[in-house]
Amino acid sequence: MTSAIGFALGLLVFAENQNAGDQVTVLRNVAVLDGTGRAVQQNQDVTIKGDRILSIKAASSVVPKGARVVDLAGKTIMPQLINSHGHLGLLKGTTMSSANYTEDNIRAQLLRYEAYGVGAVLVLGTDHDEIFGLREASRKGTLPGAAIYTAGKGFGVKDALPPLSFGMDQVFRPLTEAEARNELRQLAAKKPDVVKIWVDDLWGTLPKMKPEIYAGIIQEAHRHGLRVASHVFYLEDARKLVGSGLDIIAHSVRDAEIDDPLLAEMKKRKVAYIPTLSLDEFAFAYQNDPQWLNSPFFQAALEPGVLQMITSAEYKEKVRKNPNTAKEVSALQVALKNVKRIHDAGILLSMGTDSGAQPIRVQGFSEHMELELLVKAGLTPLQAIATATKNAAALLKVDDRYGTLAPGKKANFIVLDKDPSTDILNTRTISAVWKNGEKVNEGPLATLAKAN
């Protein structure tokens, strides 16, 4: 399925004029969800010049002379989503391997993300050095699909996380603080967007990164003007990491409720939080048949063979018998409580999914599932969407151009058949994706139908 999507999208992207220049386009009679969290503005005319939004005004009969007019009556537009925790290249079919890490595979995954309305992905720690050239092409506009942001090679632990069995054999695994600092300096020369570390013992089964090593990485990163994001599970690890200067908690705290002192310290230090709720949902959901299993929107995102894998009796039984399955169910419940506490405390909450790190963490679909889970946690649909638009752009430090729909911002948005402010599932009603003032695809379902 996905190879067909990638091929069709690639043709469409290159068929479109990627540099619209002075072309003026008016989107008529459209509802605008601007990504800031405020209410949807009905019956608007959005004027675009080149790749930027020129104005958003109440609909009228007057349009600029020579403008291209696109009637979007009955539609809603919203900013493209930004995934602030994803992975590229390692996944192919039902396998995770560094052998899968090729330019063709990365390109196909970027196009898949874009078809699902994901305009950018921050890859946290599992990239090879080739990613920096692709990132440069992405920023120049010569690489179609979602924009690349990357931590390059992350920092893990020898014989521990991240797992070698998932193709994550390229990361640094320092044994001493001095080694960690030296490797950080090597990484800094490549100018990653952030630095990624793993601090977790996988339910007490593996060695965990030593505090002196992660403290050294954080200090050295800050010396080079780089922020650090950490894989985390336990409350006490989060507390120690924040005390050591961590900038981004890249997963939910899932063993205990985040207490007021840590919330206050996070807010004081401006620590961001990426909950990746869908990660835990997917860990146990397929022991039965989840409600989304037969959804074309879900199935179109799957790598070949994954649907057969997750619907097999063997796989279901494997999940049911896994002693960690019950722990994952409990972990998600704790995560849901914590994400609401983080949001209510005014801490920067940024949508991320860990999609692409396993075959069941589906690129494109996961980002919409994450929004659904954020609403389940107690956020309104508009608040949930803001974590994936305004907030995620702020985390990437690109909110001067991306993340919201406003005059002067990039004309990058999703066209929806239904208003997601009334039902978060409506983010899945994608009829088109626009980038730099031009339509680049018609959503995953239409693209798949054309490819077939």
For the regions a protein language model found, what residue spans apply to each?
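Acidic, glycine-enriched loop/beta-strand segments at the rims
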Residues: 32-45, 57-59, 333, 362, ...
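Metal-associated gating/positioning segment near the N- to mid-region
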Residues: 76-140, 158-165, 212, 236-248
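Divalent metal-dependent hydrolysis catalytic cores, especially in the metallo-beta-lactamase
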Residues: 108-131, 145-153, 192-203, 227, ...
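Alpha-helix-loop-beta-strand connector modules within alpha/beta enzyme cores
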Residues: 140-154, 208-230, 270, 274-275
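Active-site gating/metal-coordination segments in enzymes
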Residues: 162-219, 248
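Active-site neighborhoods of metal-dependent hydrolases
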Residues: 182-205, 253-377, 451-452
